Amino acid sequence: MAVEGSRDERRFTFVSGRVRYSVDTRSIMYFESELRRINLVTTEQKYVFYGSIGEMEKRMKVDYGGFIRPHESYLVNPDHVSRCTAHEMILTNGKSIHISATRRADVKRYYSELINC
């Protein structure tokens, strides 16, 4: 897995099955972990591959920046958050993601500058 390219044209590459994929990081809405599988949801489709949400968090913060982890199972691209309350994020596709109590302060601090949570 890697993130490649300039900031405006970054691509996240990964392998699912025996196929190598490359997606524009701007289209990534969120990563969701289920056991050792990662569901990568973009504006156009969903991909599944093996990995951990912790690995995704490190990779996206180092290589791309800006992704936030509101819950132990999710890593979210803030560009796709339409609104945020103390307990949940609503994404541009209507998906609601719970903000865990242990991560609430970090999320609030992060979003207070962007969208006034």
PLM segments and residue spans:
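C-terminal structural segments of small proteins and small subunits
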Residues: 87-91, 95-98, 105
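Short, solvent-exposed loop/turn segments at secondary-structure junctions
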Residues: 75, 104-105
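Conserved binding/recognition cores within well-folded domains
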Residues: 2-92
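Charged phosphate-binding loop/patch that engages nucleotide di/tri-phosphates or the phosphate backbone
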Residues: 115-117
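Short, structured coil/loop segments at alpha-helix boundaries
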Residues: 63-65, 99-100, 104
